Every structure is written in structure tokens, then in C-alpha cells.
Curated annotation (Swiss-Prot):
Function description: DNA-dependent RNA polymerase catalyzes the transcription of DNA into RNA using the four ribonucleoside triphosphates as substrates.
Top-level taxonomy: Eukaryota, Viridiplantae, Streptophyta, Embryophyta, Marchantiophyta
GO molecular function ontology, one term from the record: DNA binding
EC number of this enzyme: 2.7.7.6
InterPro entries in UniProt: DNA-dir_RNA_pol_bsu_ext_1_sf, DNA-dir_RNA_pol_su2, DNA-dir_RNAP_su2_dom, DNA-dir_RNAP_su2_hyb_sf, RNA_pol_bsu_bac, RNA_pol_bsu_CS, RNA_pol_bsu_protrusion, RNA_pol_Rpb2_2
Quaternary state and interactors: In plastids the minimal PEP RNA polymerase catalytic core is composed of four subunits: alpha, beta, beta', and beta''. When a (nuclear-encoded) sigma factor is associated with the core the holoenzyme is formed, which can initiate transcription.
NCBIfam families for this protein: PRK00405.1
SUPFAM superfamilies on file: beta and beta-prime subunits of DNA dependent RNA-polymerase
Disulphide bond pairs: none
Pfam family, one: RNA_pol_Rpb2_7
Listed GO biological process terms: DNA-templated transcription
PANTHER family assigned: DNA-DIRECTED RNA POLYMERASE I SUBUNIT 2 (PTHR20856)
Location in the cell: Plastid, Chloroplast
Protein name stated in the entry: DNA-directed RNA polymerase subunit beta
Length: 1065
């Protein structure tokens, strides 16, 4: 049997980019047209096959450090021919620079790591559907989808008339479309399979006469397309307009579309014919007529065979095509200018690098599929590179996407993970590739299977797309491969034509490779996955991506076995490419000595990730020791001995404790703080730039007037903070003065007063220093002076300051397990108050037992009990999910047997009590009494998530107000206020606190006059006055109504008798 190894997780990105460099780039450059000027005097062409990519000027690491783009320059030979003189000029021209993919599978753009995610779209071709009209009669439609997303719909309505729908509201007879494409009626009737039926359907379309010629049909189609009434006469311009706007945009199939159309309609059109032909429309109409009479099948639009993946190669090739179109237009524009000025052009003067550079800059900067790489931990990077998005240009929108599109489909098996997706608006639209999935050249998702041979025991591996595996009976991955003798008798569950069947083993064609074949990398890291509800497994796989790398990483006791490959493929671990001897070793580099040369491996030292976590590598080898090829040289962040290590194995108990774990809240032991169990490092970057203003240049200095010397204590003579300084909130990091107009200061009354009394000159500059924001205290670890790439005139200098913080775990931080069991820390207990085991070990974390039954994530119980056994036996377990394929209750049996072994080996009978297996008697740390009920305890692998209270806590006493509503702004970053909504108002009304409610709705919110009056009252110590006018929000409502020509006024309605009672008014 052929042994199958796990594919490299980041391979999809590399394969896509290699295809672009090796095929897409030369293909697009070769398709660049020969350009002639209007007078046909000059002819310009480039030789795309002979292009050259220059070696990047900087290394990957230097590009990150200097905040520039890691790219390669493209050079191509160009030729300009003067036809009359027969003069030929040949030059090698610079087309522009293309960002290169680095060794991590990402792009460094302006010093920032970005990733291009794969897009999954409707595949071009034709799709048939049926729906009922308002009378309950079926309407059959065939939708032709072009390569660019344009659509042409053919339909047979309830009255058996055939239409071509050119927009939602406009449709024309199919005959008009076919005649406009150059056919005549006789040709059409000779080409269709059912001419009599076709003619009968056509006659029902309209009572008026059909167009007699192609010209009349073109006019008719043009009138319908542009909604033009009255008489219109044929002209060549109408034909060209229709060709460009209709046939080219809506009917360009591309290579994939042509293959799909040929397969669906059984055509033999050559693959290079990328536009829709009349014979395609005729074959499509034939199929539509067959559907009307019950022949043929309706397409399932959500099946993966009807969708394709746009990889990195396709997206970059589209951008290159756009850039070359812009270059073509710029060459034509230059030709026009050159002929007017009577200047002789050269190939170098014709070609400008701006179109290519700007197109790729726009794409990487603002395209929705080019995303800021999520670098919270190594797993996050891998999952981000393997993401599939249905959103983006040509795709779906989150507001209009239906439930059917978002749902799991049977064809996703082994290709798209049924578990891992976003929560909220993007659910089902953002997916993740399954662990073994591959993307073919045509954009189909493929999955590997073992082909079962009837003649021998050998099984070969084949890759099948979603369209191909429908014809096979496939045994599922959680079936056990039994002996040849027992296989023949056994009934096996299998997949066949999107359904699950139970068949004899001899009828099975293919077998799945791996029980985890159906799941993504994130879901595959969850042990005992099969015991969890899918919703909680989704949360678990998503929250692993939010885990912060800890100061002391620790690998999990219970895992699934793919932790090491995840760490290796993420690039955070340094691996030896050769065998040799470690000659030199320190914290910055490892020098490996080979027979004839030395290899220098530079390590990553306290580098900031995109998510402000710390990327740092520690050597794992010893000096003068010999190592082998593939051996781990250094561990990265969140890895331990080459394995992914996102959290910590800690002792947990499932029990209530004084109500402090109400609603998933969590109690922790103070040991986790003092022993730095959950301490993480975060590095924040602060930026300041000195610009050249209209009043003069800004300057960095340590001489800042009106600022306390204490705040400036860390600055050097240039006004920049010293590396290694410990800075607190409010300290100046970079001193900067900005010039301002002197005249305005002198015109101000206080300026004149100062001059008159003291003879003081008002300052000509104001301080615009970079200060440490609230919560930003820490150690300055790096200072970078950046020079801008484009050397723009108004930017003089940019400085980046990096501040490192060590954050211990605290109340308000979010922690989670791998099974979707998340919670917020509500209390930190002293060690002596924590419940403890019978051997005196205090519990580290108390979880709520009520969080398990209703959530149905029982996997956490199996994990924590097996972890407890592993901690006493000093064992690590790597268990592939779906172990029930061996026998019933296999997980439970394994856990209890390991607990029994641990109790025997350690002579602690309380580890496994037959009366309460998996539970223990705990002792209350405060009273010393045993708790009444036995309690489930174990070693769970708990993660500290990036949602930390230091980043979220916020308070406001005063701050900015919105200009229109005059209410406080929203959000922590804007120093905003807390929202008091209608429900909060109801609560205050329920308590009858009228004055507090009035203050909240007026003084504290948007009553401008009352705000000033309250300030004066507080200063003078007078009672706070009540607001007696309307707040700004009411005035805003009045103004908005006035803009609609509605005036609100108050009028006293009364009669002459002023003693009239109120009830009678």
C-alpha cells in the first residue's frame, strides 16, 4: 500500500504564485497587442516571452525593517518601428515592479505582511433551473455565466415561449438573438434537434413579424438593450457597440467556461474558442426544450463542481492584465502627443512603469482579497493562508447571500471544512480548506482517496474533483481498514451520489485516506472532536486562532498528532537544511559548519507581529554538537520542541464556587500570576513623522517649552527616547515642535496683553510630541528611522518606537479551551483558599459545570481526565478523533484505563474510584471540609486569548463631542462615552430616578448651555441648575423636519372661557 503523508499546509500559496511567475506572467505579456499610431507611421510591440525578473534589491527581513515593499523589477525587450523609413529601435524597457512572495507564503508591502486569500466563485458555463410562476406552472431557465460574471438567461415561460433575458426587466425572443449573431431561420431549423417544436414555441412569442435580416435583428436587440423607442436604423457603429457591450462582456467564457459548456451540452468546440458561438445558444435551447419534456437534469448550483477557486495566480494575472491595458492606453496617448509635437519617440520614452506599479499598489492596498496577515500565533497564519472567501469582486455579498449558499453541501466532503467558518454575518461565506484539499490548474478542489484494487492488496492514491467522485462508492474516513477476510463479510457505510448508503465492502471503489481528511487544520487540532457539538467545535477552532503566545510555552498532554507539522509549516520554527556541526551559537544567530562552507541562521529576536504579539526564537541545540538535516534549531513563539504550544496544561475542577463562576465566569489561582503561567509579551508600535508645513519644517528636539522636565527625562539630544528606557503613561517618546503663524498669536487678545505687560514674545511653535498613551507603559526595545520610498516632498522623516509590555493574567481577561468552552476571569483566589486534591495540590482554575450539558461539548471532559492521567504517568497522548471506529465507547474506555494505570502506578486510589470514575473528593481550602459531592477534576489545555482587559477597559470624565448631535463620541480610541439606550432609560424609569435620568439625557449628553452652567456651578460651589430648554438632539430633529418642509410649533388651544377644564380641551 502506498503510504500517504500530510501535505505542506502552506503549499497552496506557493503553488499559486509559482504558476503566476512561470505561466501567467509570460502569457499576459505575450498577449500584449502590437500598437500603431493614428497615422500608422509607428508600430510598437514588446516581446513578452523574453521577460526578465531582477533579483530583489533587499532581503525579506530588511524590507520589513525598512518598511518598504519586497518586490522584483520586470524588464522586457521592446521594439519601435518607423514604417516609412524602415527604421527599427530595440531597447530593454522597465515595465515596473511586482511584489514577490516571501518564504512564509506572504507578501511584504510597505514593511507589512499581507496575504492573498483564495476566492470561490460560480464557475463560468451554463446552469439550468426550474421554478414555479404565479399560476404554479414550471418555468425552465438556462443561465449562461461569463468569465467576468456577466449573465445571459434563456427561459421557457408558462406559455411555452422561448426568451433571451438581457436584464431583469427586459427580454427578447430567442430568434432575435440568434439572427443578431449572424444566423438565418433556415440555418437555425437545420441545427436544432427538434425544429418543429422550436418553430411552434417561436410562433407563440409575438404576433408581429420577425426581423428579416441580421441587421434588423441587431437594431431590435439594441433597442431592447438600451430601452430605445421609435425608429432606429442600422449602422456599423450600432454593431460595434453591441459587440463590445453585449457579446464581449456577457459572452466571454474563458478556457474553463468553454470546457464546462462543451461537457454540459456535449459539444466539440475547440478550447481556444473563448466566446459564446451561435451553436452554443442552439445547443442550450435544445437542452431547455428537453427539460420541458422531462429529459435532462436540473443543476445544483451549490455543488462544488459548479464552483471554481480563484487562487493567487488568477488574481495576480487579472491585475497584470488590467495594468497592461492601462499601459496600452498610455502608449496610445503618448503617440498622439508625440505626433503633435513632432518628436521622435523611443521604446523607453513610450513605456512608463506607473501603470504596473500603481495597479499592484492598489490591489495589495485596497482589494478585499488582499488582507492584513493575522499573526496572533503560528496557527493563525496557516489558517489565514488556507482561507476560502465567497465575498469580493464577482462574488456574493454578505447581505444578499441566501441560507442555501452558506450551508454545508455533500460535495464539500474532503475539500471544504464543514466546521471552521466565521460567526455572524460571514457565516458560511468564509470557509477553510480541508487538510488534504488541493486546487487544480482549472480551479477545481480535489481530495485524495485510496483506490481499492480487487486483484491485489495494493492501494494507489488518486485525486478526484467534486464532479468525478460522484460516480464512485467511497468508504468514509472513520471506517477501519480491516483484514481481507473480514472485509468481504462486513457492511460498510459509504458515500454515493451525494447520499450515504450501507453496502458490502466488495462494492466499495475508493477509501478515504485519513479520519481528519474532512476537517481544516484548526478543527483537526481539537482532541475528541467527535464528542463535541459542531457549533462548539466551530468556536474552539476559531478561538485557537486567538490564543496569545505565552512567555513559557508548554505542549499539550492530549493532542491529535498534527501539532508538529502545524508548527513547522507556519515558519515560526527554524529547521536545519543540512546536516553538520554547530560551530557558534548565541541568542541572535546559529552558525552551522559543513564540510566546505558555513551556514549562518539569523534568529528572530523580539519582533512585533501584525497583531502586536511577540515573535521570538530560542535556540534548541547545543554548541559543538552534530545535527542532522531537518532537525529543529530554534523554537519560535507558541512552539515547544517543534510542536505547537498555544496554552498551558492546568488543573481544573468543574464545580460552583460562591456564584463566582455564574454564566461561564472563571476563578483562577494566584499561582498563575506569580509563576508567570499565563504571562504574555506584547509589543506596540508608535509612529510620528516630521512634515514640511507651509510655515516651515517640523523638527525633533528635546527642548520643549511648557513641559515638565520629568516627562522629558528619557530623551536624548535629538529629542528621541533612549532604547531600554522604562516609560509610563504621559512620558514623551519623541519631542517635536511644529511652527505656527506668529501673526495670529499676536492678534489674539491674550498675546497682546502678554506683550504689553511682560514684554514676552508669544511662541512661534507649538508642541506636537509623541507621548505614551493610557495603558501603554513598558520598555522601549527598538527605534527605527524610516525614509519614505517615494521621497515625497512634504515628508521629512518617520520614526517608529517599539514598546514591550509583559502582561500577567488578570480579572477581565478571556480564557478558553479547545472545545468552545470560553469564559472571563471573575476572581483571583489565594492558593490557600482554593479547593485542593487529597494529596494537597490546589486547583488552578474552577470552571462552571453548567457550561457542559447544554453546550454538548463533552470532549473537554475526556481531554481533562486523560490529561490528569498523563500528568501522573508523565505521558503525552496523540489521539486521532473518531476512535469509536475501533469499538463502541473507545474514548471512555481509554480514559478510564489510563486513570486506572495512574492510580496503580502512583498508589493514589483516589485517582480512579470505581464508584465515581473520573470524579474526586475535593477539600475546601477555607474550611478544610470535604465537599459534599464528588467533583470532576483534570488537566485541561487552556488558552489565554487576545481579548484582554487592558485593551478594552475605558472610562471618560470629559472628552470630544460630535459636531452635529453634540453628543459624546463612541469608542475607546476616540475617548468616547457610554451609550445610554432606550432599555437603559426604561430601567432608570422603573427605579423612579428622575433627576439622574434628566442629567443623563441633557447635561451629560447634548445640552450645550446646561454643560457650561454645571461647570460654573461646580467651580463656585452653587447647586446644579436644572436645564430649562430643549437639548441639542431635539433641535436637530426640528431642523431635519424643516429640511422636509415641516414646521413644529407649540400653540395653546383654548376658547374664550379661560376657566375651561383641562379635560375638555
Amino acid at each position: 500500500m502506498e503510504i500517504f503523508i500530510l501535505p505542506e499546509f502552506g503549499k497552496i500559496q506557493f503553488e499559486g504564485f509559482n504558476r503566476f511567475i512561470n505561466q501567467g506572467l509570460s502569457e499576459e505579456l505575450s498577449n500584449f497587442p502590437i500598437i500603431e499610431d493614428i497615422d500608422q507611421e509607428f508600430e510598437f510591440q514588446i516581446f513578452g516571452e523574453q521577460y526578465k525578473l531582477a533579483e530583489p534589491l533587499l532581503k525579506e527581513r530588511d524590507a520589513v525593517y525598512q518598511s518598504i515593499t519586497y518586490s522584483s523589477d520586470v524588464y522586457v525587450p521592446a521594439q519601435l518601428t518607423q514604417k516609412k523609413k524602415g527604421k527599427i529601435q530595440k531597447q530593454i524597457v522597465f515595465l515596473g515592479s511586482i511584489p514577490l512572495m516571501n518564504s512564509q507564503g506572504t507578501f511584504v508591502v510597505n514593511g507589512v505582511a499581507r496575504v492573498i486569500i483564495n476566492q470561490i466563485l460560480r464557475s463560468p458555463g451554463i446552469y439550468y433551473n426550474s421554478e414555479l410562476d404565479h399560476n404554479g406552472i414550471p418555468i425552465y431557465t438556462g443561465t449562461l455565466i461569463s468569465n467576468w460574471g456577466g449573465r445571459l438567461k434563456l427561459e421557457i415561460d408558462g406559455k411555452t415561449r422561448i426568451w433571451a433575458r438581457i436584464s431583469k426587466k427586459r427580454k427578447v425572443s430567442i430568434l432575435v438573438l440568434l439572427l443578431a449573431m449572424g444566423l438565418n431561420l433556415q440555418n437555425i431549423l437545420d441545427s436544432v434537434c427538434y425544429p418543429k417544436i422550436f418553430l411552434e414555441f417561436i410562433k407563440k412569442n409575438t404576433k408581429k413579424e420577425y426581423p428579416n435580416s441580421t441587421e434588423d435583428a441587431i437594431v431590435e436587440l439594441y433597442k431592447h438593450l438600451y430601452c430605445i423607442g421609435g425608429d432606429l436604423f442600422f449602422s456599423e457603429s450600432i454593431r460595434k457597440e453591441l459587440q463590445k457591450k453585449f457579446f464581449q462582456q456577457r459572452c466571454e467564457l474563458g478556457k474553463i467556461g468553454r470546457l464546462n459548456l462543451n461537457k454540459k451540452l456535449n459539444l466539440n468546440v475547440p478550447e481556444n474558442e473563448i466566446f459564446v458561438l451561435p451553436q452554443d445558444i442552439l445547443a442550450a435551447v435544445d437542452y431547455l426544450i428537453k427539460l420541458k419534456f422531462g429529459i435532462g437534469t436540473i443543476d445544483d448550483i451549490d455543488h462544488l463542481k459548479n464552483r471554481r477557486v480563484c487562487s493567487v495566480a488568477d488574481l495576480l494575472q487579472d491585475q497584470l492584465k488590467l495594468a497592461l491595458n492601462r499601459l496600452e492606453n498610455s502608449v496610445l496617448f503618448f503617440f498622439r502627443g508625440a505626433t503633435k509635437r513632432k518628436r521622435l519617440p523611443t521604446p523607453k520614452s513610450l513605456v512608463t512603469s506607473t501603470p504596473l506599479i500603481m495597479t499592484f499598489k492598489e490591489f495589495f492596498g485596497s482589494h478585499p482579497l488582499s488582507q492584513f496577515l493575522d499573526q496572533t500565533n503560528p496557527l493563525t497564519e496557516i489558517v489565514h493562508k488556507r482561507r476560502l472567501s465567497s465575498l469580493g469582486p464577482g462574488g456574493l455579498t454578505r447581505r444578499t447571500a441566501s441560507f442555501q449558499v452558506r450551508d454545508i453541501h455533500a460535495s464539500h466532503y474532503g475539500r471544504i471544512c464543514p466546521i471552521e467558518t466565521s460567526e455572524g454575518m460571514n457565516a458560511g461565506l468564509i470557509a477553510s480548506l480541508a487538510i488534504h484539499a488541493k486546487i487544480s490548474i482549472l480551479g477545481c478542489l480535489e481530495s485524495p482517496f485510496y483506490k481499492i484494487s480487487k486483484l491485489s492488496n495494493l492501494e494507489e492514491i488518486i485525486n478526484l474533483s467534486a464532479a468525478e467522485d460522484e460516480y464512485y462508492r467511497i468508504a468514509t474516513g472513520n471506517c477501519l481498514a480491516l483484514d481481507q477476510n473480514s472485509q468481504e463479510e462486513q457492511i460498510t457505510p459509504a458515500r454515493y451520489r451525494q447520499d450515504f448508503v450501507a453496502i458490502a465492502w466488495e462494492q466499495v471503489h475508493l477509501r478515504s485516506i485519513f479520519p481528519l481528511q474532512y476537517f481544516s487544520v484548526g478543527a483537526s487540532l481539537i482532541p475528541f472532536l467527535e464528542h463535541n457539538d459542531a457549533n462548539r467545535a466551530l468556536m474552539g477552532s476559531n478561538m485557537q486562532r486567538q490564543a496569545v503566545p505565552l512567555l513559557k510555552p508548554e505542549k499539550c498532554i492530549v493532542g491529535t498528532g498534527i501539532e508538529s507539522q502545524t508548527a513547522l509549516d507556519s515558519g515560526s520554527v527554524t529547521v536545519s537544511s543540512h546536516g553538520g556541526k554547530i560551530e557558534y551559537l548565541d541568542g541572535n544567530q546559529i552558525i552551522l559548519s559543513l564540510k566546505k562552507k558555513k551556514i549562518d541562521k539569523n534568529l528572530i529576536i523580539y519582533q512585533r507581529s501584525n497583531n502586536s504579539t511577540c515573535m521570538h526564537q530560542k535556540p534548541k541545540v547545543e554548541k559543538q554538537k552534530y545535527i542532522k538535516k531537518g532537525q529543529i534549531l530554534a523554537d519560535g513563539a507558541a512552539t515547544a520542541n517543534g510542536e505547537l504550544a498555544l496554552g498551558k496544561n492546568i488543573l481544573v475542577a468543574y464545580m460552583p464556587w460562591e456564584g463566582y463562576n455564574f454564566e461561564d465566569a472563571i476563578l483562577i489561582n494566584e499561582r498563575l500570576i506569580y509563576e508567570d503561567i499565563y504571562t504574555s509579551i506584547h509589543i506596540e508600535r508608535y509612529e510620528i513623522e516630521a512634515r514640511v508645513t507651509s510655515q516651515g519644517p517640523e523638527k525633533f528636539t528635546n527642548e520643549i517649552p511648557h513641559l515638565d522636565d520629568y516627562l522629558l527625562r528619557h530623551l536624548d539630544q535629538n529629542g528621541i527616547v533612549l532604547t531600554g528606557s522604562w516609560v509610563e503613561t504621559g512620558d514623551v517618546l519623541v519631542g517635536k515642535l511644529t511652527p505656527q503663524e506668529t501673526e495670529e498669536n499676536l492678534r489674539a487678545p491674550e498675546g497682546k496683553l502678554l506683550q504689553a505687560i511682560f514684554g514676552i514674545q508669544v511662541a512661534t511653535s507649538k508642541e506636537t510630541c509623541l507621548k505614551v498613551p493610557p495603558g501603554g507603559r513598558g520598555r522601549v526595545i527598538d527605534i527605527r528611522l524610516i525614509s519614505q520610498e517615494d521621497n515625497s516632498a512634504n515628508t521629512a522623516q518617520i520614526i517608529h518606537i517599539y514598546i514591550l509590555q509583559k502582561r500577567k493574567i488578570q480579572i477581565g481577561d478571556k480564557v478558553a479551551g479547545r472545545h468552545g468552552n470560553k469564559g472571563i476571569i471573575s476572581k483571583i483566589l489565594p492558593r490557600q483558599d482554593m479547593p485542593f486534591l487529597q494529596d494537597g495540590t490546589p486547583i488552578d482554575m474552577i470552571l462552571s459545570p453548567l457550561g457542559v450539558p447544554s453546550r454538548m461539548n463533552v470532549g473537554q471532559i475526556f481531554e481533562c481526565l486523560l490529561g490528569l492521567a498523563g500528568s501522573f504517568l508523565h505521558k503525552n497522548y496523540r489521539i486521532i478523533p473518531f476512535d469509536e471506529r475501533y469499538e463502541r465507547e473507545a474514548s471512555r474506555k481509554l480514559v478510564f484505563s489510563e486513570l486506572y494505570k495512574a492510580s496503580k502506578k502512583t498508589t493514589n486510589p483516589w485517582l480512579f474510584e470505581p464508584d465515581n470514575p473520573g470524579k474526586n473528593r475535593l477539600i475546601d481550602g477555607r474550611t478544610g471540609e470535604i465537599f459534599e459531592q464528588p467533583i470532576t477534576i483534570g488537566k485541561a489545555y487552556m488558552l489565554k486569548l487576545i481579548h484582554q482587559v487592558d485593551d478594552k477597559i475605558h472610562a471618560r470624565s470629559s472628552g470630544p463631542y460630535a459636531l452635529v448631535t453634540q453628543q459624546p463620541l463612541r469608542g475607546r480610541s476616540r475617548r468616547g462615552g457610554q451609550r445610554v439606550g432606550e432599555m437603559e432609560v426604561w430601567a432608570l424609569e422603573g427605579f423612579g430616578v428622575a433627576y439622574i435620568l434628566q442629567e443623563m439625557l441633557t447635561i451629560k449628553s447634548d445640552h450645550i448651555r446646561a454643560r457650561y452652567e454645571v461647570l460654573g456651578a461646580i467651580v463656585t460651589g452653587e447647586p446644579i441648575p436644572k436645564p430649562n430648554t430643549a437639548p441639542e438632539s431635539f433641535k436637530l430633529l426640528v431642523r431635519e423636519l424643516r429640511s422636509l418642509a415641516l414646521e413644529i410649533n407649540h400653540v395653546i388651544i383654548c376658547e374664550k372661557n379661560l376657566k375651561l377644564k383641562l379635560k375638555e380641551i
